Regions:
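Metal/cofactor-centered catalytic core regions of large enzymes
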Residues: 1-168
Length: 168
């Protein structure tokens, strides 16, 4: 992002929602930190990343009913753009095509690319979250997200067993 390696995944998504002022996310993050009596910097740890998975799940679960209501309302009103039955029939498929899909997987951004020739997959590629997070230094010699995370001063429970770094 703008020339810098960025971590992807639940913590990144929760922090983005928090920074954007998403009310439920701010409430959940603040109350979690308060209940655990932890400072904000605790988010950038194994505990913080685990908590982010849980908090993100709560935010998504809370939104699902509204999304379902909108979908059903649109279908009842005749808006069926989310489903095109004709495109589900193999006879309607082109002999050659290219496709790309992006989504947020539990560990972070996921991209899939496909090339179809003679109605068969000619090439398929997935760029998985670990590709983003574990990427090497870039052309400007900036560290990838994992390396950058290890450069900070981590407080270790036992300096002879730095498992926090491995888990985070």
């Amino acid at each position: 992002w703008q020339g810098h390696a960025m971590e992807v995944g639940p913590l990144a998504r929760v922090l983005m929602l928090y920074a954007k002022g998403h009310d439920l996310t701010q409430h959940l993050v603040n109350s979690t930190l308060q209940q655990l009596d932890l400072p904000v910097r605790a988010l950038f740890s194994t505990l913080g990343r685990t908590a982010a998975r849980t908090l993100e799940t709560a935010v998504l679960a809370d939104g699902m009913q509204g999304w379902l209501d909108s979908l059903v309302g649109n279908i009842k009103a005749g808006d069926t753009r989310t489903f095109n039955e004709a495109q589900c029939k193999p006879s309607s498929w082109p002999r050659e095509a290219k496709g790309v899909g992006f989504m947020e997987a539990p560990r972070g951004g996921l991209a899939r690319y496909v090339v179809i020739k003679d109605q068969k997959i000619d090439n398929y590629q997935a760029v998985v979250p670990s590709t983003w997070n574990a990427g090497p230094r870039d052309v400007q010699n900036q560290p990838g997200a994992y390396e950058a995370a290890l450069q900070d001063n981590h407080e270790l429970e036992d300096e002879t067993k730095p498992v926090e770094i491995l888990r985070t």
